[in-house]
Each structure stands twice: as C-alpha cells, then as structure tokens.
From Swiss-Prot:
Sequence ranges of Acidic residues compositional bias: 1087-1114
Location(s), subcellular: Nucleus
Residue ranges occupied by any SAM domain in the UniProt entry: 1194-1258
GO cellular component: nucleus
Cited function: Polycomb group (PcG) protein that binds to the Polycomb response elements (PREs) found in the regulatory regions of many genes. PcG proteins act by forming multiprotein complexes, which are required to maintain the transcriptionally repressive state of homeotic genes throughout development. PcG proteins are not required to initiate repression, but to maintain it during later stages of development. They probably act via the methylation of histones, rendering chromatin heritably changed in its expressibility.
Organism listed in the record: Drosophila pseudoobscura pseudoobscura (Fruit fly)
Ranges for region Disordered: 266-285, 381-401, 488-510, 1007-1063, 1083-1167
Biased composition (Low complexity): 381-394, 1038-1050
Protein name: Polycomb protein Sfmbt
Length: 1274
C-alpha cells in the first residue's frame, strides 16, 4: 500500500508514526523532510526545548513530548521568594542545584521548568557565587543539624497525617531513583508541619556582608531562608509574618513575589550568630530532631509508590508516564488517556487536574499561569530587584531600618494602577484561552485588622511590625509554637533574653490579625473527588439531567409526546426487561452496577394532603424516604418507608428529577414529610428513620452527574459528515447534523431538506474524507469534492464544521491496516451470508462485489435481480457483526432467504456454489467473538425501527444466536422483525425514551386492527417490499413523498419504492382534532365501528396543526397531525406519522371507489359525478391508471373534495373562493400557494407536495424521473 494515500488529518490521533517508522518512511509519508530525532536529542544541551515527537506534531496528533535542558553556565546568583502554592516553580528557582545535578533523573522530572529571564536577560535560577559557579558551602555539625531539623521535622507517629495542602520541604516533595523509572513522593505531612506551612507575607534578601534583611513580599506569601547546611537547602516560613504587610504592598507584583539578588550567601557562622542573637534555646530544639531524622526518612520510604516496571515505560509522576513514550505501549485506553499541556506527561485523564483535565499535577497547572504572568511582569520585577539589592548592604543590626526602606520602596511600587494586574492576567488568559483559573475579585483584596477595618500601617508601626515578624520567624525556626510567637516580649522566644523588641511593638503586633485565606490574588482549580461523597452544604451537587425541568411522570395528567407507558406491563409477573448494563451506549451504563435492590433514596411524596401541581422549572416540596424493591431497565419499583404492605408501591424512572440520594433534602433545606396514610403510625419518625437508614446504601452523590455526562453527545449541531444515501445505498452523501435527541442525530442532506435519524454510534455515518480515503462513491458539492481530492496528495484542509474521526465509534483502528500492514482477506466474487440492509428480517446469500481499503468491501444481496448500475451494493466492514460465513443460518437453524431463482425448501450452498462457480469465504475471515452481553429471549426493550428510524418502538428479544439478536416489535408480525447485533446502538433499555424526551411507539390495539379491514389490496411479494431499508425516515413533508412513489410492476424490484413501516398510525378522514385529543386513546375510543368516516366541518385549530413543524425534519416527537397527511402510503410506502396520530395501527385504505371500498365512496368523490377523487396516501400508480384519474377535468368542488380527503380540510374554502379548478391546481407552485394561505410556509409545502404526488399518480413515468433526479450524484 502506498503510504501517500493516507494523508488524512482525521487519522492523526490514531497512530504514532514516529515510533513505528524510519525517518525515510516518515519523509515519504509526510511529503517533506522531518526532524532528525537522534541529531536533535544528541544536541539537546544547545536548545532550551526539544520536540520529542515532531512527526506526530506535524500530522496533528495529541501526543507531544517536550524536554527542557539544564543551563550549563549560570550567571551570578539570583533568588526568588515565591508563593508556597507555586512550589513546583520554587523547586526550580529556589536553589536545589545539588539534587538536580547529582540525580540525573530529576532533569526529566523538572524538564518543564525552564529558566525565567528578567528584563535584562539575567537568568533567575540556582544560587551561584559572583564568579558564576555553583556554591557549595560547608558547615559545622550544628549547622548541619539545624538544616536537617527543618528538612526532617516529622513526628514519629502517623496518626496526625493528613493530605497535603501546601508542600513545604522539597526533599519531601520529590525524590527520584537512579533508574529514572519510579517516583518517590511524600503524600502526607504531620499537623505540626502543616502549622509551619501556612503561607506568610515576607521575603528575604541576601546582603553582601553575609547578613540578611527581611523584605515584605505580599499577603499570603512565604519567607525563603537559607539553611546554611552546605547543600543550599531553603525553607519557607509559616503564617507568622502576615501582619507585617502594609495595606497595598501586594499590588506591586501580580503574585506578590519579590525578586531579590545578592552577592555572597551568608556563611554558616553568620547564620549561627543570627540564630543565637534571637534565641538561646536552639540547641535543645535542634538536637531533639536528630533522632527522628533517620526514622522519618525510613517512614517516607515505606510510603513510596512502587510502580510496575515495564520495558519502555518510564513514569514522570505517580500517575503519568513520560511524554516521549509511544502511546500504543501505554496500558491506558485511548478514550481515557490525557496529555499534560505543561510537561507532556501521558496518564489517565480522570486523574488529571483542572476541570478540563489538562495537567498531570497541580504544579503544572499553577506553574503555567505563574510563568505566563511572571514573564509579563519581569520588567517591573527587575526594577524592584535593583531597589532591594541597593538596600541590602547594611549589617544585621540595621535590619529594622533596612526593612523599613524596603517597605517604602514596596509602597512606592504598589502605586501602579490595579488595572495593570487585571491587564496582565487578562493577557495571560488571552494567550491561553483554554485556561480556566478563577481570579479573585480585586475589590476584595484588602487587608483587615482584628476589628474588621482596613489596615493602614506606615512609618514606625511598619518597622516595629517587621521586626516583630523577624522575631517570630526566629522563634518558629527554633522550635517555638506558632501560637507562642504572639506572646509579648521575651515570652515569644522562650528564654526572656531578647530585648530588641519593645512592648510597643508587641502591642502593635497583637492589634493586627493575620490576612484571611480568602484574600488571595487567585484561586486554584479544585481537583475532582475520586470517590463519591455525600455533598456538603457549601458545595451542592450538580443537578441531574432533567432536574427541576421535568414534570412528575407519576402524576402527569397530560403527556405532550403521547409516549407508550410501560406501567401496565411492569406490574406483570412474567415481565422481564433487559438490564441497563446490557447496553454499553445507554446513559449511566458504567455506573448502573452501583445500584441494587434495598437501596434507600429520597423521592417525591405524593401521599400528602395537598398534591402539588408541578410546573416545568419547579421542584416538589414534599419528599420521603423510599426503598428500591425491583429494577427493570431504568424503572424501579419503590415503597415508602413505614408501609408494611405493597398497597402504595409505585414505579418511577430512576433517572428523573424525583429520585435523589439520602441527604439531598437536607442540602436543599427541604423537610422529609411522612405519607399521610401512615403519618400517625410512629410517634418519633426521626428515630424510625435513623434505625432504617443505619448501614443502608444510597445513590452515589455523583450519580446524576454521571448520567448527565453520558447523555452529552459527541456531536454538535452544524457538523458535516458523510452518511449512507438512503435513496442509493451504494454511495455516501454529505449531510449536516440538524437535531440531536438522546445521542440520536437527524442528518439533513446537503442538497435537499430530506434526511433521516440515526445514532451517533451507527456504522452508516463516517467522518469527513472517509469516502475518498477508502474508495467509496460520494455525492457532495463540487467544492467539497475538490477539497477531498486535494487531500489525497497532501493533508486534507480541515474546516471548523468538519466531523473528524475521533467523534465516531469503530470496532477497528486504521493502524491495523496502515502501520501493521494488514490486508483484507476477502476477494471479489466470494460468497457469504449477510443481513439484508434493505430488509433486516432476512439473512441472505451475498457476493463480495468490490474490495475497498482498510477492510471495507461492497457486497450485493443475491436475493434480488442484479442491477447493472451497482445501486444495490452496500458497504460492510470485514469486522462487521452483520456478515457471516456460508452455512451460518443452517448451522443455527435460521431460515435463510434463498438467492434469486432458488427455492427456499431446496436451496443448499453446495449446489449454489457449484452453479455459480464461486468460492465461499473462509470462516477465519469473520470476527464472531461473542461478548457476555446478558440478553435473553423474552426480554423487553425499546428499539428503533431502522426501516423508519425516527420511530422508537416497544420490542422484545425473540431470539439470541451468539451475539446476534432477533428483535420483534410487539403487536406486529414476524415480517417486521430485525436482526441486530448485541452492541447495536439502535436498542435501548426500558425507560430510555422518557429519559431523553423521545416518543415511544407502542404496539397496536386489537380493536384498531379489526377496524382496518376494508377491501384488501393485492399483496406484493415480500422481496419487492424491501426497499424500505434505504433508511427512509419520516423526513421532510415537502419532498419525502416524491422519493417513495410507487412505480409500476415492470420496474425492477431493486428500484421500487420503500415498504410500509408498521409502527406509524393510520388516519381516517376524521383528523381535525383539538390538541387535547391528540392521543392514542382518543382514536381508539372514537373510531367508527364500520370503518367509515364522515366528513367533518373545518376546524379552526387545524391551522395550527398544519403550521407546526413545517421544517420537514421528521421529528416524530414534535410533529403534528397535519404531517401525517403529507407522508404517504402504498403497499410499499411508509405511512406518515406524528404525535397526534396515536401509537400505532395496521394499514388501512380510506381512498374509496366502487371497486375498492363501496361505503367510503361518498367521502372521496363529488356528490354530482363519478369522478375519482383519491386519497394519495392509499393508492399506487397502477391503481390510479386503472381508475382513470383525470385531475385536469376537476371543477372547483372536486378540488375542494381532493383537499378534504387528503387532510387539508381547513383550506377547502380558501381554494373554493379563489376558483381553483383541476387545471389551475396542477399549475400551482409553492410561490403561488403561499399568498393563498396567508404566507404560511408549512401548509403551502404540504399542499404543494400533494399536487406533486397527484402529478406523479397521473404519469408514473414522471414519478420515476422525479426520483432519479433526486438521486443524482456527482
């Protein structure tokens, strides 16, 4: 196979060419040279970034790896004091060069953190000496102990462990082994560490003399202190310096981070002196920590996550692999895989951070926004850095005065407008429009004192507060409790020797309250809870899919969709519904195993004094606890708690707005009210419920969120795709998604208003570019064809509204055929058995007519006469579950439909193959893996009628043969059964229709069948009725009838119109009904017993019926009675349908003549003549010719009668007043009709289509020509 034939943009996410092909092959594939991977990797130290997978990036794949290299030469030392929330960035910027250099694996762990450049080009990174070399100071034993005290200050016990909110020690944060294939991190910290980890608001500057100076960094930020242990360890201090910040210091930088620089780091002796000047109790505090150091290091080892070592798999974090790994070897399903946009790590999407699951860790999420804003503010930060550096040359005793200078500079810097902050953040969001970090309202960023008033510190007060903050810092470092730091005078240090802080400072410090947590410059995105949790008051659960928008189905007096109600059958003992888990595509299938009998829920209480009339948008106010007794499909039988009998048991859909998990009422402030019948049964209902609910199970708190997510379609309105042409099944046609109901799509063809319904997982829809890729016939606009043909030489130009391959479900991957070199084992001329796509109730011998690419092939059903044009071919994939080896039917006792010219009683494959000289396809070519689907004979379900796919009907599993199901439509003969695969997207659990808001067609009534027995028409052989499979829908009223017009008997069977679908209600003349009568019961109770119908006066409400739903999309749940008059019926045509037409009915003939129906002659002809006035939905062309249909001889009254018998009674008078006779009627166009009807588009389209049908009945050749013109393709 020539690789250049597969330049498809929509295939890019399916394979990883870079890891399976040589560079020469990649060059041939992409038609241009690619990046040399080995050359780039060998020279990676010369580049800050490297594209690890350039070919995938060129093709458009999702897996991009990035690597960052460590700078070999570092400029003089520069240090950044950063927020503890940004600790991943701090790990790179804070000076831990020894860990990074000694452990080579850490380079990959921190590859996403490149050097941050300031305005002058100076690199901000690891601390260095003035000569640009890494600093490696030594220290004495005491200094080393002091450093380890901070690093390993863990408690021996593990009882106080709790999830980390802010990580403090970098040693505890990440440890990489030498094999670079595992990750060591500390997932918990003790409560004492957490106290120290509270964010603060101070920064630290290094001074040339080795001294240190405290600088104000901003609210909720931390102080970076060198440990002086020779390893360049640093420590972030706790929330003890927060009160020392002036009012608006934080405004000088977006995140309050102060950029400070220094010459030489403080020596260990100076650090020791600095500690001793503040406290004499250091030794005891530090020595006690030495013993726990080794113990806690051992404990951290026991908490290490041990990954499974596989060849070629290298972990980046505990939940993600490195980005330069071939995704095909990673043991993660493609639909559950995600790639970190920050570092390129690949992992499970559910474990990623942010709502859109775009980062592998919170560090990547925070670091991205941090770096974006920091780069924008670098110029301002550089100015602040130089100011801080100029003020950091005085020795340690002048710390107070120096701090005051820094404070004044910071105050001056904070005078910039607040709009600068908003502008910077806004610019960051513009550059990364997909980032969804929440920014706190700037108006709330105001520091308050203990009295709730804005703080205004300045002059000496600020100096005293800074000095007090310094004392508190030293106290915290020496082991003093954070709470003790607030004590006056020497008590804060524990020894009483400190006299540097006067009482005024203490009092000033006590008057300032710490900055509230809410006063942060931004908030992080909350990670999703891994396990279902009971919702808390401050975070209510998301509403269920129909929450507060759906009427109570148990008390609904009027159902606008007139759907079939399962309730009468649910109460039968022998009723068996297929479980929801049998339908992989059904909403909630993945969480349905969590539900079970005995589970407690809160449901609406309908047994109360005042039954509420719930309107859309309202929620019931009365609820009570109930127990699930039985589950059938989406329906559940429940009993209120407190009833001892089943007298008040009720059925309810588990996925509607009435059912909630226990505790939902408490979160909404709704009381639990016991049913009125038993309200006096117990004195204390609270104790009763406590006893019943103790140890009971309830719905997961995220149950409705899961249901809602599974209801979301992958498609959107306006997308273009390629789908089977229902008028010519051997070609695909460009169509547009115009409606979506429960993941079912209504596709409208590009050149007509016609279309059909199908599920988004259906195999008859394909992505843009599919036809030109596999070699299938395509009907599309000229510009589309040119774009697709151009894509065969280069990549397809993808438009915004193109449906790409990731939206479609397939049971194979293109990798198998392109990368692995797999070929199609089928060859032309092979014989097999297949489900007839035009008659799903039969399995027939078939012939492979053409072999396409990627496993597709065109087959022809041998039961029909051959069509030289090939219009009867149909495309199947070699892995399709609807094709079988020769002899499959006989081996499974299935009646096979014989080939054309053979008798079903004498047909054998041996004779057939010998007569045709063909070869049967080998059995190993078929994929007949049978999953544990769970279907059994007799199970009830809801199934789409694929002969008219806009209808979803009540059905039963009649037979199970491996993975093949024979679905029987209840109330209809076996002639209308369908053979479907167990994983077909056209079958649904009981209750699916009401869940998604789709109409459910029920079985016909016996009484209604008995009515429909006027003189029968000649029966057409079965095989001539199978054109119904051309995906005919209840589509556009204006054009569908012309597609389905019955031709004469001389036409070849494969070109006849489509057969009748059983699930459409048949209408009599009496159709002008008020909306409240539009239901099945009305028709059943008001049907004349003799089958005749009398004329009825024009009804004023008929206008509304004719106006409604004139767009012709065939949506059965929204259409009205008038649409039934526009869709037609003959012995081989589909009957019109609508919500006003009741559930179902058998075919009936209301057009009457003396030879067809004697009693109805008065309805269909003039009272003064014997002219034949037909009801077009009930005759075919041969009958019209036999009855001498002559509309050009009609008078005005005959035209009025024609409109009346064809369900347009409301406009009879209009045509009569306009003196429209037969000749004038045949000359009318849509533009002529609209002014007559008051510019009503819907009725005009309906009557225009009636006229077109009438012309076709008069001239059958015109009908064939009309249909041929509609089916033309490029």
């Amino acid at each position: 196979m020539n690789p250049t034939e597969l330049h498809m943009m929509w295939m890019s996410s399916q394979y990883n060419a870079a890891n399976n092909m040589t560079l020469e092959d990649a060059t041939a594939l992409l038609n241009h040279p690619t990046v040399g991977l080995l050359e780039e990797m060998s020279g990676h130290h010369h580049q800050p970034t490297l594209e690890m997978n350039p070919m995938m990036g060129l093709v458009g794949g999702d897996f991009n790896g990035h690597a960052a290299t460590l700078s070999g030469t570092l400029p003089p030392g520069t240090l950044i004091a950063t927020n503890s929330n940004n600790l991943y960035s701090f790990a790179h910027l804070g000076g831990l060069q020894h860990q990074l250099l000694q452990q080579s694996a850490a380079v990959a762990a921190f590859q996403n953190y490149t050097e941050v450049m300031d305005a002058d080009g100076m690199t901000v990174g690891l601390a260095t000496d003035p000569h640009g070399e890494l600093m490696d100071e030594t220290c004495d034993d005491e200094d080393q102990v002091y450093g380890h005290q901070i690093d390993d200050g863990y408690d021996d016990g593990g009882a106080g462990l709790e999830p980390k909110q802010e990580i403090i020690n970098i040693d505890d944060f990440v440890m990489m082994n030498e094999d670079n294939n595992s990750y060591d991190g500390t997932d918990f910290m003790t409560s004492s560490d957490k106290d120290i980890s509270q964010s603060s608001s101070s920064g630290l500057t290094h001074m040339q003399g080795g001294g240190v100076s405290l600088g104000v960094a901003g609210a909720e930020h931390d102080l970076l202190v060198p440990l002086g242990d020779g390893l360049m360890h640093h420590k972030l201090l706790g929330a003890t310096l927060a009160p020392a910040m002036p009012l608006n210091v934080g405004n000088s930088n977006v995140f309050g981070n102060i950029m400070v620089t220094g010459a030489d780091p403080p020596s260990s002796k100076q650090m020791k002196g600095y500690r001793n000047s503040n406290s004499s109790g250091t030794s005891s505090a530090t020595v006690t920590t030495v013993a726990s150091t080794a113990v806690m290091r051992a404990q951290r080892k026991t908490r290490k996550i041990e990954p499974v070592n596989r060849p070629g798999l290298v972990l980046k974090t505990p939940i993600a692999y490195k980005g330069n790994i071939d995704p095909s070897v990673i043991p993660i399903q493609k639909d559950g895989m995600a790639v970190c946009e920050r570092c390129g790590a690949i992992g499970v999407k559910h474990t990623f951070y942010t709502k859109s699951r775009r980062f592998c860790s919170m560090a990547c999420a925070r670091g991205e926004l941090y770096s974006l804003v920091l780069n924008n503010k670098m110029e301002t930060t550089g100015a602040t850095t130089s100011n801080n550096q100029s003020t950091s040359s005085s020795p340690l005793p002048a710390a107070s005065g120096t701090s005051l200078d820094v404070t004044e500079d910071a105050l001056l810097a904070s005078d910039q407008p607040q709009s600068d902050i908003e502008l910077d953040l806004h610019a960051a969001h513009i550059k990364n429009a997909n980032y969804r970090f929440r920014i706190t309202d700037q108006s709330k960023i105001t520091q308050l004192n203990s009295f709730g008033e804005p703080m205004s510190l300045g002059g000496d007060a600020a100096a005293h507060n800074v000095q007090m903050a310094a004392d508190e810092t030293i106290a915290a470092l020496n082991g003093a409790a954070v709470g003790d730091a607030a004590a006056p005078g020497g008590e804060a240090n524990g020894s009483g020797n400190d006299t540097s802080t006067p009482n005024t400072a203490s009092s000033g410090y006590l008057s300032a309250a710490p900055t509230p947590k809410a006063l942060r410059l931004f908030k992080d995105v909350y990670p999703q809870d891994d396990l279902p949790q009971i919702p808390k008051y401050e975070r209510l659960p998301a509403p269920c899919p129909q929450m507060e928008k759906v009427l109570s189905i148990r008390r609904r007096m009027y159902d606008p969709t007139h759907s079939y109600d399962w309730l009468p059958r649910l109460n039968k003992e022998n009723f068996n519904a297929a479980p929801v888990t049998c339908f992989p595509h059904a909403p909630g299938c993945e969480v349905w195993d969590n539900l079970g009998v005995g589970m407690k829920v809160e449901v609406e209480n309908t047994d109360c004094d005042n039954i509420e009339i719930i309107q859309p948008g309202q929620t019931p106010t009365s609820f009570w606890v109930a127990t699930i007794l039985e589950i059938k499909g989406y329906k559940a039988l429940m009993s209120y708690e407190g009833f001892d009998t089943d007298s008040h048991d009720f059925w309810v859909n588990l996925c509607n707005a009435e059912v909630h998990s226990v505790g939902w009422c408490a979160t909404r402030g709704k009381p639990l009210i016991p049913p009125r019948t038993i309200e006096h049964k117990y004195k204390d209902w609270k104790d009763f419920l406590v006893g019943r609910l103790s140890g009971a199970r309830t719905l997961p708190s995220n149950f409705y969120n899961k249901i809602n997510d599974s209801l979301q379609s992958r498609f959107r309105l306006g997308l273009n795709l390629e789908c089977v042409d229902k008028d010519r099944i051997s070609q695909v046609r460009l169509a547009t998604v115009t409606k979506i109901v429960g993941k079912r799509l209504f596709l409208r063809y590009f050149d007509t208003d016609d279309g059909f319904w199908c599920h988004e997982d259906s195999p008859i829809i394909h992505p843009v570019g599919w036809a030109t890729t596999v070699g299938h016939n395509l009907a599309a606009p000229q510009d589309y064809l040119e774009r697709m043909l151009a894509g065969r030489e280069a990549m397809i130009e993808v438009h915004e509204d193109d449906a790409t391959i990731e939206l479609f479900k397939m049971n194979f991957t293109f990798d198998e055929y392109f990368l692995d070199g797999k070929t199609n084992g089928f060859i032309e001329g092979m014989k097999l058995e297949a489900v007839d796509p035009l008659n799903l109730s039969s399995i027939c011998p078939a012939t492979v007519m053409a072999v396409l690419k990627f496993g597709y092939m065109m087959i022809r059903i041998d039961s029909y006469q051959p069509d030289e044009s090939g219009s009867d071919w149909f495309c199947y994939h070699e892995k399709s579950p609807c094709i079988f080896p020769a002899g499959f039917c006989s081996a499974n006792n299935i009646s096979v439909t014989p080939p054309n010219g053979y008798d079903s009683r004498t047909f054998t494959w041996e004779v057939y193959l010998r007569n045709t000289g063909a070869v049967a396809a080998n059995q190993h070519l078929f994929h007949r893996v049978v999953p544990e689907h769970g279907f059994e004979t007799g199970m009830s379900l809801e199934c789409a009628d694929l002969m008219d796919p806009r209808l979803v009907c009540v059905a039963t599993v009649a037979r199970v043969v491996g993975r093949l199901l024979k679905v029987h439509f209840d109330g209809w003969t076996d002639e209308y059964d369908q053979w479907l695969d167990c994983e077909s997207a056209d079958i649904y659990p009981v209750g699916w229709c009401i869940l998604v808001g789709h109409k459910l067609e029920g079985p016909p009534r016996v009484s209604y069948q008995q009515v429909a027995k006027p003189a029968p028409k000649p029966k057409v052989p079965r095989k001539k009725k199978t054109k119904k499979g051309a995906s005919t829908t209840g589509g556009g009223a204006a054009k569908q009838q012309n597609d389905n017009t019955q031709t004469t008997q001389t036409v070849k069977p494969r070109t006849i119109a489509l057969k009748t679908t059983p699930h459409l209600p048949k209408l009599s003349i009496k159709l002008e009904l008020k909306p409240e009568h539009h239901n099945a019961a009305f028709y059943e109770n008001n049907q004349p017993e003799d089958g005749d119908g009398d004329e009825e006066d024009p009804d004023p409400d008929a206008d509304a019926d004719l106006d409604a739903d004139a767009d012709g999309d065939g949506d059965g749940s929204t259409s009205h009675i008038s649409e039934q008059s526009t869709t037609h019926s003959s012995s081989d045509q589909i009957l019109g349908s609508g919500s006003g037409g009741g559930s179902t009915s058998a075919p009936v003939v209301t057009a009457a003549t003396g030879s067809i129906g004697g009693n109805s002659n008065k309805m269909n002809s003039s009272a003064t003549s014997s002219k034949y006035i037909p009801r077009l939905a009930d005759i075919d062309a041969s009958e019209a010719a036999h009855l001498e249909l002559q509309p050009d001889s009609w008078n005005v009254y005959d035209v009025s009668q024609f409109l009346r018998v064809n369900d347009c009674t409301a406009y009879c008078d209009t045509f009569s007043r306009s003196k429209i006779d037969g000749k004038r009627l045949l000359q009318l166009t849509k533009d002529d009709i609209m002014p007559l009807l008051g510019m009503k588009v819907g009725p005009a389209l309906i009557i225009s289509d009636l006229i077109t049908q009438l012309k076709c009945k008069v001239n059958p050749g015109r009908a064939r020509s009309h249909k041929t013109n509609k089916s033309s393709y490029l």
